[in-house]
Amino acid sequence: NRNYVRSVQITMAESFGVRSRGAFYEQTGTIRDVVQNHLLQVAACIALDAPARGDSYREQSARLLRAVVPIDRDSVVRGQYRGYRNEPGVAPDSRVETFAAVRFFIDSWRWAGVPFYLRAGKALATTATEVWVAMRCPPRAVFGERIVDPCNYVRFRLGPDVTTAIGIRSKVLGERMSGEPIELVPTSRRGTRLRPYTRLLE
């Protein structure tokens, strides 16, 4: 909740372009394609209160999404990768976004003041979908040093490999009382990569 979480970042990056979906993308863009449905659903999974029963998940998710504060223009960044206008089915003067970043807040006691960031784009440096929950810095420095970012975090890699990781500061070796950032990876599931909708259905 807001007492411990500084921000939540949800990223869906793809290293490839629109491929043969140029005409489709001209009608949708990144926001309508993945942000307003897939990434918002992931945000709901992270932020909703635990449902009392399995069948009340949808109700809790809808309640949380209704609490999202209306997003203003200054909280959205849109971009288009170089070469998109040369893709088959794409207008030569297209202004459709292939990258979008959105910041929003949830109007609830639990999440008041905590920014949620959604990012998605094509033709980026890597392909990965992950959730990064940044924790608030502790009130005092354990190692007697100025607390610097990043503080502790929890990272969920949703694809293509499934990984859960925790980022912390650990004491460096030796007598010196100072810390260094390390990442603990308690769970890592690698193997057959499922297509996105196959993973959803299974």
Feature locations, PLM:
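Secretory/organelle targeting and membrane-embedding segments
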Residues: N1-E202
